[in-house]
Amino acid sequence: MEVTVSNLSYTFSPKQPLSLDHVTLDLPKGSRTLLVGANGAGKSTLLKLLSGKSLAKAGHISVGGKDPFRESSSAFVYLGTEWVNNPVIHRDMSVARLIASVGGDKFAERRDFLISILDIDLRWRMHAVSDGERRRVQLCMGLLRPFEVLLLDEVTVDLDVLARADLLNFLQEETEVRNATIVYATHIFDGLAEWPTHLVHLSLGRIVDYGPISKFGALMTRSSTGNSALLETCLEWLKEDKKNRGTREEEKRSTWDDVQESLKVGTDVFTDYFKISRAK
């Protein structure tokens, strides 16, 4: 499905700056788009709006010709970091039961393949797994049903190198064989040099640049540092973002001297713990 965004603006509060500022995008069906931007650039906000989890009050969003907020579909899949904080998936239950609850029997072949590439042990108990293992289960559950649009927000952060590489290969095949569309926000660029078909650079809620990978010709070659040219380019973008962000916000930032007086007032049991433990 094609993903189209036109003149999209969004703020969490009228008193706050825009989290997204007149964003316009057109991502074709079957594309693999990498969202690049510093923390606070608006990547997560954009993905949640595309998934229909939040209402776009200014501008227009179309996913496969539909408004994702008003016309939700099981073909639209959003996977974000907040899932691991859900108390339900920290209970003493088997991984097999959890996977079965979302259609594990209906998509048996796909289930077995995902369990294999994500290296999931069906004997795991959810209350006793690591963060990385819990993330693998989330990905298996989220990818179990064939999707048409997949929105990923930092969900590979807990995966080891092998699991992440196998997952990226699987996702690439999904776009090439089934013509699915993927939008992926991450700060981990290892192994991505030849993965994306499109790049989007977000900074302070605005699109700095975007387009097919062919538009960024230098990315197709390797840099002299040994890093992929994609990684080097993203690093340069993020450095420039930080520089611009600092210039615009410098007057708003407090110095350590500014907050000294507030530290003298009152007490806190949590910070007192650190004072005592570090004093030993």
From Swiss-Prot:
Entry's Gene Ontology molecular function annotations: ATP binding; ATP hydrolysis activity
Signal sequence, renumbered to the chain: none
SUPFAM superfamilies: P-loop containing nucleoside triphosphate hydrolases (SSF52540)
Superkingdom of origin organism: Eukaryota
Ranges of residues in domain ABC transporter: 3-229
Protein localization: Cytoplasm; Nucleus
GO biological processes: nuclear-transcribed mRNA poly(A) tail shortening; regulation of transcription by RNA polymerase II
Residues binding ATP, per UniProt: G37, A38, N39, G40, A41, G42, K43, S44
A single cellular component GO annotation: CCR4-NOT complex
Alphabetized UniProt keyword annotations: ATP-binding, Cytoplasm, Nucleotide-binding, Nucleus
Pfam families: ABC_tran
Primary residence: cytoplasm
Name of protein: ABC transporter domain-containing protein C20G4.01
Species annotation: Schizosaccharomyces pombe (strain 972 / ATCC 24843) (Fission yeast)
Native organism taxonomy: Eukaryota, Fungi, Dikarya, Ascomycota, Taphrinomycotina
